[in-house]
Amino acid sequence: LSTLLENVGGLYAALLSDAEIVVPSLGEIGYSGSAGLDVPTLIACLHRHRPESAILLPQLLLALVMAAERGAALPDSLKFLAVGGGRVGETLIARAGAVGLPVFEGYGLSECASVVCLNRPGATRAGSVGRPLQHARVSVRDGELFVEGVRMLGYLGDEVSRHGPVATGDLGHIDDDGFVHITGRRKHLFITAFGRNVSPEWVESELLQHPAFAQAVVHGEARPFNIAIAWLRDPALGDEALRAALDAVNRALPDYARVRDIVRADALFTFADGLLTSNGRPRRDAILARHADAVEACYARHASEPIFFDHLQESAA
């Protein structure tokens, strides 16, 4: 209940609907420390309380989907699982549907009273965060989403204008049917050495849907190719198996967004180590700084490999 989303979506909406609210302890859900999750404990908790609805982060959804794909039985009481707080790949939504999980992706921000958009039964589009709710109006300017309507009063000690649209900092577009699509954060967008814009969240969401990768941060600013710093679900995974996993992910990406190589993280990214925010998002600069030597070594290792311009010069010769 420390987040506005859980208060608005999990508490207030349920109370207004005359629903029962269950708030298990973190231990009962299966959490341990800042990043540990015991999935069987989580599933046992779901069976014990048989909820009809819950709000999940993409990482929790992936854990449930992977468990179900391996034969774990999930409760049939679930009717609406809202997922948000990070980019959710279309493949993960499809996998959730295939194992019978009623997942609906949404989008929001605290400045705009939490939930802004939501897919709903009968109004769902894969790859989108749904249509805006009645209290919000969403527009796009220079690729960035702006929101008008009900909003917060401001931050303590910080004057915030209550007039005009809120610049979300999120990149995206609205399709012809009014569904909003998010591609990443403006401040995280990087430009490769060949002038291609890449939203790292998009590439990371593809990596994290593969069972080999537990955490990943993609880097390619002013570089000839992209790399990812990743913590593997099995840190002992061999190089050949890791290469095969990366190749499988890259097949779903255009050439400019593909990841050339993986830098193995030296430890799980955690809030306690300063590598995650309080809501579980990666602190990119801190992760890059911690692995700077390994990143430079990775780029140096591939420095002699031909790249696009090398092939172009060979063709012209």
In which residue ranges do the predicted regions lie?
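Active-site loops of AMP-binding adenylate-forming
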Residues: 109-127, 150-154, 158-159, 234-236
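Ser/Thr-glycine-rich phosphate-binding loops at phosphate-binding pockets of nucleotides
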Residues: 108-112, 168, 192-193, 277-279
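AMP-binding/adenylate-forming catalytic core of the ANL superfamily
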Residues: 146-148, 171-263, 268-273
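Alpha-helix/helix-capping structural signal
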Residues: 59-62, 86-87, 91, 150-151, ...
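Conserved C-terminal "lid"/linker of ANL adenylate-forming enzymes
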Residues: 215-218, 250-317
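Conserved ATP/PPi-binding loop(s) of AMP-dependent carboxylate-activating enzymes
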Residues: 128-134, 141-165, 179, 196-198
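Gly/Ser/Thr-rich phosphate-binding loop
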Residues: 12, 16-20, 51-55, 59, ...
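Conserved AMP-binding/adenylation subdomain of ANL enzymes
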Residues: 2-53, 58-62, 67
